[in-house]
Amino acid sequence: MEYLVTMTTHVPDGTSAEAVQDIRGREAARSRDLAAQGHLLRLWRPPLQPAEWRTLGLFAADYDAQLEKILASMPLRVWRTDQVTPLAPHPNDPDLETREPGSPAAAAWRSEFLTTFTVTVPDGTPAGEVANTEAREADRARELAAHGHLLRLWRMPGAGRTLGLWHADNAAGLQAILASLPLRAWMSVQTTPLTTHPSDPAPASS
């Protein structure tokens, strides 16, 4: 099972710079260990306010209690609060192994983004129209994955909610991509631009 974890760190007042550097170094080493074990999949930095220390992580664990043990093993946990969102498989989640080397999906991109979709079908919409729109959405997802824009999709807790991981040149490029989705007229979208985290286990070419 996969999880999105929002990790917010609050360094206690009076903590020395040396202590902060020490725990950050141990955190980086532990992150490498967890990545090697297949538990830590990705790390990103979301937009931050001045003096804010927050990280988004994609983790894998067999069950909730195992994830808690994983998070508790990270040195920064003593200063950190974690918000965990369990993620379920999505039928349109791209199969990363089908991408060919040298394709746009394997090239370096400028930016990554997370999106949260909430789909609300208007009352009275015929079932046939819903089925047709969902089928076209699946086709479009495959096209965007083949072009390297759509990386992952997961179901989130709550009706009609989906988490997506995307590649685009910039925010305007992402908005153009999202506008091409057949379900766009029925969905609200929350977008989070991501920047590189130094301990992200993903290769630079992902």
Predicted regions: what they are:
Residues 1-206:
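Conserved, structured core segments of small domains
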